[in-house]
């Protein structure tokens, strides 16, 4: 009799629509995994987002930092997590560059995740040491081409977005510069400020204060249009580099097989945060911009990720750069 009752109960559950099963979601705290150390740009975005989403969802969204291996450690962790809607990943461009940078990976960005949404874009800036003779982009291009063997191009480390930006710059200029990798943006900036290196491409979250203080030369921003944080800064395309665009974008992912209804509810909380004025203002203060509505969807993120993999793969492979 007990067996029959159990079977009847099981069949009853199977007849309940999937959406109904997710109506009570979430019933406990949710983990948002960040692939980098606390205090960095992605971590700041994640924590600001998590605080807003916690209010919307009625459960705490806990940020967990799992730094290492250029973000692939966190990616592998989330890919193998239970697909129940209680573990998510927020990652930047590293999701699109890892397939080319790493010959061995524990996950496939295009097949091992469900896509939730993009969130915010952080523009990059091209800056130079204050005493560099070139004062605008046209002058810098001429100076670089005439002094290619003397120019030191700093970056925040192998595979960092600043490294990728530097590779794209060299391709656009048609030169090979001496690249100097550092263990993060802070030491790279310090070297630039101290005159040990000549130019650096890095995020507005790190460079804006120095630009406004006048301690570096600003040559332009790496976006298609000018940005609100630095409205007088020309784009690099305006400066002569055709169709030049590099942004630090952030996408949110879930383990493959996570219920669609849970992804929709979590994604809805993301979209609510992206429209919250306090969140928008905080991001603007960091130089970050909210992505358009078309990117705030699973398909928008999937399409963007696929395009970025196609964009960066050839750049990285042509440079012969590997992180493992």
Write out the residue ranges for each language-model feature.
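Short beta-strand->loop
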Residues: 108-118, 176-180, 198-199, 208-246, ...
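An extracytoplasmic/periplasmic, membrane-proximal ligand-sensing/linker region
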Residues: 27-29, 212, 238, 260-324
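N-terminal (or domain-start) structured segment
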Residues: 22-111, 150-152, 158, 174-203, ...
């Amino acid at each position: 009799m007990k067996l029959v009752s159990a079977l009847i109960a099981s069949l009853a559950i199977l007849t309940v629509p999937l959406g109904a099963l997710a109506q009570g979601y979430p019933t406990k705290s949710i983990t948002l995994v960040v692939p980098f150390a606390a205090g960095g740009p992605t971590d700041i975005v994640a924590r600001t987002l998590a605080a807003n989403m916690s209010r919307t969802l009625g459960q705490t969204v806990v940020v967990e930092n799992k730094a290492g291996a250029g973000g692939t450690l966190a990616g592998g962790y989330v890919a193998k997590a239970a697909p129940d809607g209680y573990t998510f990943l927020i990652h930047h461009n590293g999701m699109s560059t890892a397939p080319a940078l790493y010959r061995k990976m524990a996950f496939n960005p295009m097949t091992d995740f469900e896509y939730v949404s993009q969130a915010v874009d952080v523009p990059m800036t091209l800056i130079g040491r204050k005493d560099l003779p070139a004062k605008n982009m046209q002058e810098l291009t001429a100076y670089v081409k005439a002094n290619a063997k003397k120019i030191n191009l700093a970056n925040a480390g192998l595979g960092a977005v600043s490294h990728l930006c530097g590779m794209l710059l060299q391709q656009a200029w048609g030169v090979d510069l001496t690249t100097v990798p550092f263990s993060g943006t802070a030491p790279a900036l310090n070297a630039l400020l101290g005159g040990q290196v000549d130019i650096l491409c890095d995020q507005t979250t790190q460079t804006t204060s120095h630009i406004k203080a006048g301690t570096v030369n600003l040559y332009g921003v790496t976006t298609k249009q000018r940005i609100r944080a630095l409205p007088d800064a020309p784009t690099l395309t305006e400066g002569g580099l055709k169709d030049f665009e590099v942004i630090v974008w952030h996408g949110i992912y879930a383990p493959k097989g996570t219920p669609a209804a849970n992804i929709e509810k979590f994604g809805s909380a993301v979209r609510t945060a992206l429209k919250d004025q306090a969140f928008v203002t905080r991001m603007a203060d960091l130089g970050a911009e909210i992505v358009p509505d078309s990117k705030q969807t699973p398909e928008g993120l999937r399409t963007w990720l696929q395009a970025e993999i196609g964009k960066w793969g050839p750049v990285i492979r042509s440079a012969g750069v590997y992180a493992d």
